[in-house]
């Protein structure tokens, strides 16, 4: 199976994040060529986190962005640095693990060198979740470019998400349901919105693959790998690795792994 070495377009999930309490705090902006939003539903003010969130997202960008000449990954790819930070090495090892488990459908390298585009947003989400929890918040909803991680609830009930219809995202979501309060991360990958982000071969019999995982890093990488594997091999790989996955095929039919019922009964 040809490796995937570039990040896939991640379908925007339909977020139904309303709240009857004005305490809901939303810190949002732009990063990585897309948007981010961090919603916190707590009775204490978390205004002090706004700059910390932005700083952490920027810090991660200067480790993994191939578009910044001075980033760690750019310096390594250009031969200007031979040293790897622990953070870089850890993400490389995670990428290699997914590559092995997926039979090579995921790779942290392309012809230009190392590239963590297909795992970097998920990693950034996990880092922001760490920051939020370290500051005492346990009810939050983090989203970067259509990938999410949430925990707890908003003031008037569970956080809710929906998976867009790949063919016509303006219609109601393909599915929508409550996010488990104990916390979950979700990433969706596919080709129809940004086909240039798909590298390598594969059956191309899927419109989208959505993965739910405790780690946004793993959800991001697995969504990429399973999309490339295609419906049959992707489902087989999801089952063998105990993954919760929702597939939408090119005929707009859906298939799900057995563990998806733990996310949406």
Kindly give the residue locations of the regions a language model identified.
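Mature catalytic core of soluble alpha/beta enzymes
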Residues: 2-7, 11, 18-265
């Amino acid at each position: 199976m040809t490796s995937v070495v570039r990040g896939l377009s991640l379908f925007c999930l339909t977020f139904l994040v309303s709240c009857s309490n004005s305490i809901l705090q939303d810190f949002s902006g732009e990063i990585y060529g897309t948007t981010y939003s961090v919603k916190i539903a707590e009775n204490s003010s978390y205004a002090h986190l706004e700059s910390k969130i932005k700083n952490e997202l920027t810090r991660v960008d200067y480790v993994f962005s191939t578009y910044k000449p001075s980033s760690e990954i750019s310096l390594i790819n250009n031969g200007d640095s031979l040293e790897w930070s622990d953070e870089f090495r850890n993400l490389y090892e995670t990428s290699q693990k997914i590559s092995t488990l997926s039979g090579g459908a995921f790779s942290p390298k392309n012809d230009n060198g190392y590239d963590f585009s297909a795992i970097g947003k998920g990693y950034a989400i996990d880092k922001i979740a760490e920051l939020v929890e370290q500051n005492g918040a346990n009810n939050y909803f983090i989203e970067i470019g259509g990938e999410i991680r949430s925990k707890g609830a908003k003031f008037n009930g569970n956080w809710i998400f929906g998976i867009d219809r790949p063919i016509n995202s303006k219609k109601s979501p393909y599915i929508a349901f409550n996010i488990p309060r104990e916390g979950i991360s979700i990433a969706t990958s596919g080709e129809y919105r940004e086909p240039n982000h798909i590298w390598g071969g594969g059956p191309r019999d899927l419109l989208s693959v959505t993965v739910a995982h405790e780690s946004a890093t793993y959800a991001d990488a697995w969504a990429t790998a399973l999309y490339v594997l295609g419906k049959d091999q992707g489902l087989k790989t999801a089952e063998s690795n105990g993954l919760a996955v929702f597939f939408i095929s090119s005929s707009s039919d859906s298939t799900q792994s057995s563990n998806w019922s733990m996310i949406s009964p």
